[in-house]
Amino acid sequence: MKNPIITITMENGGVIKAELYPEIAPNTVNNFIDLVNRGFYDGLIFHRVIPGFMIQGGCPEGTGMGGPGYSIKGEFTSNGFKNDLKHTKGVLSMARAMHPDSAGSQFFIMVADAPHLDGQYASFGKVIEGMEVADKIVAQKTDMYDRPYEDQVIKSVTVDLQGYEAKEPEIIED
């Protein structure tokens, strides 16, 4: 079976395509697909961009403090879940607070390798096309909070399931 493919279309026309890995982080993938299908990410920004590290988006408030109103269990090794997908350039992973089960909608795309994140965050996909778009986003001038002065707006995120049957995500109510 083929893996689902997401397409992130930026307001400026840039396109990032990524393959999701349900065999590595099934609930994380199901949650992401559910949010995509609800149009959750449409119009949001990459609010945190750090050269040599990653770009982060998926916060409805654009501050890094927001989420979907619930969280999901962290599917990563230090949280008792086997996940061997390394945080190398192009990998998608879920942002979270200190608590291991605090991820919701915020995600990041690695623009460089960050082995210190391996086993600590739920990696769940990888860019297969348009990595140069992420590289352009991370090169934007930012304020002291790593937020680009010019909003990097996600126009839409869509998913091609390619035969994958997404299930209702298991959530933890806030």
Task: State what each model feature region is.
Residues 1-174:
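Cyclophilin-like peptidyl-prolyl cis-trans isomerases
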